């Protein structure tokens, strides 16, 4: 699906693969589980692709070497870099690479695998021991959403809000997802989310319920970044990136408090405006 996503991105942009000179990836594709050491490797799948020294390349991880070996039409790539973490990090690495002149046409791809179909069914979660500082963080079995759930609980107390107020937002998010033909919901579960569904959902980490969490899927997304000069002649109307920014504050404890999150978010927003040379009055919409 990684190779397919990349090829579709180039086709959608009307770009000749030979013109691509940059590649940014996230080498990590796991959603919590890794290939068990005692489980036989799927050699039939592995051997159907050009291989690297790491047999699980293309199965439970990615490398630029594996991608280039299996996408022979990418003949002009001379810049590769990893953007580790969320898709947003890989995207900003690609944007900065274009801005710094390290490439003029750059593919960026992020893939996720979840072979078990559930989160955290392998790796450390399958172990009988919790080593090192993980014992402090994970001994009580908190799910991945608990940090955000704690912050949301603080938000509700601070501003007099409730979990139910999120229902219209979540209903609209599902509605938007159903209008995205490439997405999971449109392809596999074309069903609306109702207010009653949302309110009746079981808690995962109160006040975060089932529908406040994402769903484990196998997916790959690819985007193409290029210079403004080249973008004007491509098939699709381009989106121009004015700036990107982040904030790297250190929380006082294991999970950032709401006050810390609000402070860092505000700092990021100010950096975005300053670097882009605009103010809030220039925005026609907000996406947060």
Locate predicted features.
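N-terminal beta1-alpha1-beta2 module of alpha/beta enzyme domains
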Residues: 1-7, 11-13, 17-29, 46-49
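Conserved catalytic cysteine-centered active-site region
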Residues: 27, 31-105, 113-147, 188-213, ...
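Acidic-enriched catalytic cores of C-N bond-cleaving enzymes acting on peptides and small amides
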Residues: 163-170, 179-181, 192-201, 235-236
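Condensing-enzyme catalytic core mediating Claisen C-C bond formation in acyl metabolism
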Residues: 1, 8, 134, 167-171, ...
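Beta-strand segments within the central parallel beta-sheet cores of soluble alpha/beta enzyme folds
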Residues: 17-27, 77-82, 106-111, 164-172, ...
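Active-site-proximal alpha-helical scaffold in enzymes
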Residues: 81-112, 145-182, 223-229
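Phosphate/pyrophosphate-binding loops at sites that engage ATP/ADP/AMP, CoA/4′-phosphopantetheine
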Residues: 7-21, 155-160, 268-282
């Amino acid at each position: 699906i990684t190779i397919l996503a990349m090829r579709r991105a180039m086709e959608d942009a009307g770009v000749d693969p030979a013109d691509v000179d940059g590649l940014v990836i996230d080498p990590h594709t796991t959603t919590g589980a890794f290939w068990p050491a005692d489980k036989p490797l799927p050699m039939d799948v592995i051997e159907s692709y050009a291989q690297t020294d790491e047999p699980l390349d293309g199965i439970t991880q990615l490398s630029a070497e594996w991608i280039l070996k299996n996408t022979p039409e990418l003949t002009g790539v001379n810049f590769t870099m990893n953007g580790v973490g969320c898709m947003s990090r890989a995207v900003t690495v690609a944007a900065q690479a274009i801005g710094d002149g390290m490439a003029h046409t750059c593919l960026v791809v992020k893939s996720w695998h979840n072979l078990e179909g559930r989160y955290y069914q392998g790796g450390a979660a399958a172990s009988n021991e919790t080593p090192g500082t993980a014992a402090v963080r994970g001994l009580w079995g908190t799910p991945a959403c608990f940090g955000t759930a704690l912050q949301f609980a603080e938000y509700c107390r601070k501003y007099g809000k409730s979990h139910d107020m999120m229902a219209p937002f979540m209903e609209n998010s599902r509605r938007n997802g159903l209008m995205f033909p490439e997405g999971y919901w449109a392809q596999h579960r074309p069903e609306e989310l109702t207010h009653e569904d949302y309110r009746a959902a079981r808690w995962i980490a109160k006040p975060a319920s089932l529908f406040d969490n994402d769903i484990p899927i196998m997916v790959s997304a690819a985007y193409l970044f290029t210079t403004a000069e080249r973008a004007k002649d491509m098939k699709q109307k381009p989106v121009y990136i004015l700036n990107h920014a982040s904030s790297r504050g250190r929380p006082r404890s294991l999970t950032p408090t709401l006050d810390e999150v609000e402070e860092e978010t505000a700092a990021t927003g100010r950096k975005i405006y300053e670097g882009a040379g605009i103010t809030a009055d220039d925005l026609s919409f907000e996406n947060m």
